[in-house]
Amino acid sequence: MESGTSSPQPPQLDPLDAFPQKGLEPGDIAVLVLYFLFVLAVGLWSTVKTKRDTVKGYFLAGGDMVWWPVGASLFASNVGSGHFIGLAGSGAATGISVSAYELNGLFSVLMLAWIFLPIYIAGQVTTMPEYLRKRFGGIRIPIILAVLYLFIYIFTKISVDMYAGAIFIQQSLHLDLYLAIVGLLAITAVYTVAGGLAAVIYTDALQTLIMLIGALTLMGYSFAAVGGMEGLKEKYFLALASNRSENSSCGLPREDAFHIFRDPLTSDLPWPGVLFGMSIPSLWYWCTDQVIVQRTLAAKNLSHAKGGALMAAYLKVLPLFIMVFPGMVSRILFPDQVACADPEICQKICSNPSGCSDIAYPKLVLELLPTGLRGLMMAVMVAALMSSLTSIFNSASTIFTMDLWNHLRPRASEKELMIVGRVFVLLLVLVSILWIPVVQASQGGQLFIYIQSISSYLQPPVAVVFIMGCFWKRTNEKGAFWGLISGLLLGLVRLVLDFIYVQPRCDQPDERPVLVKSIHYLYFSMILSTVTLITVSTVSWFTEPPSKEMVSHLTWFTRHDPVVQKEQAPPAAPLSLTLSQNGMPEASSSSSVQFEMVQENTSKTHSCDMTPKQSKVVKAILWLCGIQEKGKEELPARAEAIIVSLEENPLVKTLLDVNLIFCVSCAIFIWGYFA
């Protein structure tokens, strides 16, 4: 087979090479290098500027972000290179229906800011497993959830984004796939490991701007190439590969390509699944995922968090126009490559017999744009990759450090937590690189669908547990635990079946079991949600209700309750008493006191001499990890609240609410127009 791949002689035989003789010229590379230097400068500036020697400073950016970097970071964290590759690819293959995920997310991010975030703020939580620990007590739910979140991050986020970004870089720079990945990660890891969330948010803001400028520019070129929207609607249905078999339906554009709502039984995205099955994973992602919630918790106050969510919601309208439509244009301009239907030719073009729609966006960039702009779009793809990777790295590190490591070592010092958080980022990188070949082998032509199907099998049970915890005071730990377990087991069964019984190619008969073949993954999401909901409700109703302290401040209806002092300290607390100046123990009176550990008497009695003759290398490493000597005198409370009040300025609140109504109205109009 290898010899067959390399034997054709004609230099421009497209089936052999999706990007013949196309790459980056010196002008493009200059733009790309400038971008890298600029991002690195912003990352290092925020690293120096912000306080990173505390858990709050590193993991939550000190809790003083204003609305616009929060909004930009929400958008950039969501829109990774997987979006550019995946949305454009699905647009090329099946039309605009995939944009339903983006429009659905618009509503969900607003629900986060107006409904879920006030509960998280009232409960003074920093991670999502911590919320469940406070709401239900015990450790089994937070531990299961922390492990599940890390699993989802590695297998549906980090690996996919690295793979998608590396495809683009590999084709444009003609580098080895893994060399491209390692180069990207080297730059990404520097400011993620060093700067924490503040560096991530500031660089996200810069990268959002670059993404929008580049993607809007390419959209303009794309529509100009096909004669605008009317030309797109007319020519898309004529975009057929010349090597397609005439007596086969494979490779034909869908008749409903310009509709979001499609047939409930035979379509790729049935409309009941879009309305209901899609909404549950969307709620999980936008309202309970650590990556997203962590950005809003870093805001100065609730109003700034709402402003950031509104900004992200407005930006969520754009992917249909800057990713999906250009993907459809790419099919029109390059039908033989993007719309290939012959498995053997597809294998030669993009190493994927299932189809090559995922090359739609890179093909458009490298073939359509002039020198300089091509480099800008490369920067856009790198920005998308790096922004989502840094966000996931920081949030996964937060979960591992605060929810798993703190449980294993409840007396861990602040210094230890800072080091563990950074080392875990490096471990994540390694595991994700090892998983890339699996993504490469299993994604079946549409990368975005790979992500969404796995999400539909794992996320609904978690979303239902959060929803029940937030809105039904009777929900208890037993109900939440058994609901979570039943839903996850059912989802894992379907996930394993999907990997065993791979979807056949268009030209092959479908002999998969009925459970896999006939139940769409969005319908399965609805089934999972229903099973989890019934289990949580039934078990909670027939077992003891939760105590008052597990409900106060932790549901929508109790978020304004007066403070109830909890007897138990969170597992993060290393000591329950404080040492006074003379070394005598004194009982702690509040959770804020019990973190003021033995600073005074350590310097007095033990005189732990950390300073003698530290080499410059050691000092540099300690600075990189945010560990500085002056931090000894002001060790902060680990469980310090981020946003401490739900109060808002009445004028600002009114302005935000008016914007909310306008934004939702725009989204409903777009849904209706393209439905």
UniProtKB/Swiss-Prot annotation:
<feature type="transmembrane region" description="Helical">
    <location>
        <begin position="309"/>
        <end position="329"/>
    </location>
</feature>
<comment type="similarity">
    <text>Belongs to the sodium:solute symporter (SSF) (TC 2.A.21) family.</text>
</comment>
<feature type="topological domain" description="Extracellular">
    <location>
        <begin position="89"/>
        <end position="102"/>
    </location>
</feature>
<feature type="transmembrane region" description="Helical">
    <location>
        <begin position="28"/>
        <end position="48"/>
    </location>
</feature>
<feature type="topological domain" description="Cytoplasmic">
    <location>
        <begin position="49"/>
        <end position="65"/>
    </location>
</feature>
<keyword id="KW-1133">Transmembrane helix</keyword>
<feature type="topological domain" description="Extracellular">
    <location>
        <begin position="501"/>
        <end position="521"/>
    </location>
</feature>
<keyword id="KW-0406">Ion transport</keyword>
<comment type="function">
    <text>Involved in the sodium-dependent cotransport of myo-inositol (MI) with a Na(+):MI stoichiometry of 2:1. Exclusively responsible for apical MI transport and absorption in intestine. Can also transport D-chiro-inositol (DCI) but not L-fucose. Exhibits stereospecific cotransport of both D-glucose and D-xylose. May induce apoptosis through the TNF-alpha, PDCD1 pathway. May play a role in the regulation of MI concentration in serum, involving reabsorption in at least the proximal tubule of the kidney.</text>
</comment>
<feature type="transmembrane region" description="Helical">
    <location>
        <begin position="655"/>
        <end position="675"/>
    </location>
</feature>
<feature type="transmembrane region" description="Helical">
    <location>
        <begin position="66"/>
        <end position="88"/>
    </location>
</feature>
<keyword id="KW-0813">Transport</keyword>
<feature type="transmembrane region" description="Helical">
    <location>
        <begin position="103"/>
        <end position="123"/>
    </location>
</feature>
<feature type="topological domain" description="Extracellular">
    <location>
        <begin position="230"/>
        <end position="272"/>
    </location>
</feature>
<feature type="transmembrane region" description="Helical">
    <location>
        <begin position="447"/>
        <end position="467"/>
    </location>
</feature>
<feature type="topological domain" description="Extracellular">
    <location>
        <begin position="330"/>
        <end position="375"/>
    </location>
</feature>
<dbReference type="GO" id="GO:0016324">
    <property type="term" value="C:apical plasma membrane"/>
</dbReference>
<feature type="transmembrane region" description="Helical">
    <location>
        <begin position="480"/>
        <end position="500"/>
    </location>
</feature>
<feature type="topological domain" description="Cytoplasmic">
    <location>
        <begin position="202"/>
        <end position="208"/>
    </location>
</feature>
<dbReference type="GO" id="GO:0006915">
    <property type="term" value="P:apoptotic process"/>
</dbReference>
<feature type="transmembrane region" description="Helical">
    <location>
        <begin position="273"/>
        <end position="293"/>
    </location>
</feature>
<feature type="topological domain" description="Extracellular">
    <location>
        <begin position="157"/>
        <end position="180"/>
    </location>
</feature>
<feature type="topological domain" description="Cytoplasmic">
    <location>
        <begin position="397"/>
        <end position="418"/>
    </location>
</feature>
<keyword id="KW-1003">Cell membrane</keyword>
<dbReference type="GO" id="GO:0005886">
    <property type="term" value="C:plasma membrane"/>
</dbReference>
<feature type="topological domain" description="Extracellular">
    <location>
        <begin position="440"/>
        <end position="446"/>
    </location>
</feature>
<feature type="transmembrane region" description="Helical">
    <location>
        <begin position="522"/>
        <end position="542"/>
    </location>
</feature>
<keyword id="KW-0915">Sodium</keyword>
<feature type="topological domain" description="Cytoplasmic">
    <location>
        <begin position="124"/>
        <end position="135"/>
    </location>
</feature>
<keyword id="KW-0739">Sodium transport</keyword>
<protein>
    <recommendedName>
        <fullName>Sodium/myo-inositol cotransporter 2</fullName>
    </recommendedName>
</protein>
<keyword id="KW-0812">Transmembrane</keyword>
<feature type="topological domain" description="Cytoplasmic">
    <location>
        <begin position="543"/>
        <end position="654"/>
    </location>
</feature>
<keyword id="KW-0472">Membrane</keyword>
<feature type="transmembrane region" description="Helical">
    <location>
        <begin position="136"/>
        <end position="156"/>
    </location>
</feature>
<dbReference type="GO" id="GO:0015166">
    <property type="term" value="F:polyol transmembrane transporter activity"/>
</dbReference>
<dbReference type="GO" id="GO:0015798">
    <property type="term" value="P:myo-inositol transport"/>
</dbReference>
<dbReference type="Pfam" id="PF00474">
    <property type="entry name" value="SSF"/>
</dbReference>
<dbReference type="GO" id="GO:0005365">
    <property type="term" value="F:myo-inositol transmembrane transporter activity"/>
</dbReference>
<feature type="transmembrane region" description="Helical">
    <location>
        <begin position="376"/>
        <end position="396"/>
    </location>
</feature>
<dbReference type="GO" id="GO:0005412">
    <property type="term" value="F:D-glucose:sodium symporter activity"/>
</dbReference>
<feature type="transmembrane region" description="Helical">
    <location>
        <begin position="209"/>
        <end position="229"/>
    </location>
</feature>
